[in-house]
């Protein structure tokens, strides 16, 4: 994940680190709780989803809003992109990178002193439940909830200080691991994630970041030539506040299509 501010002296970037293929094993003979079994199913789903997500492209519509001190919108910009996530695998290390090709970019309102938030990568918040990262979080069962008529298990997550985190804040040449905390709505039977709400477990106002909240909603996407139905991000919203500024970006993802790209390396014979 990344975000940064345009036309501002403060530049903030949020990175999701590379993901390693690492399956956590349960000690032989150890009994597992229902919550551990649910997290295990979510681990399996996310590990598969990382590869599924890189096999599709979609249309992304981004709405950027900057708010005044009284809460009214000061500036609003809208853009549309062809969007895809590029997956690379080198020696067992998986890296996810977003690619955006502009379809429509609103003509920028050149207001002096007005900065806009640019947010990238928040659709991949599901990496909290990837096997490589989930051991760095505490999970709590919050019972059941219903979204659009479908039952989900609500699971609270909180990053354990000192453990690996899928996100880090890069600011003025330094990187700060982020202590993410939030709630995920997970299908109890399949481990499919329907929604994630996340933010900072502790304030980072001392370095210029007062608060950050992000919500990602997932929806089932059927494909013509596939018997399986996959759940992909439908909307990702990001709200960021510094002591003096307030932004909200909303990313809507539509028109998912499958595609495949194969590359072949040939060495010319002498």
Predicted region positions:
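Structured extracytoplasmic
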Residues: 29-181, 188-195, 199-235, 239-270
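Bacterial N-terminal signal peptides
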Residues: 11-25
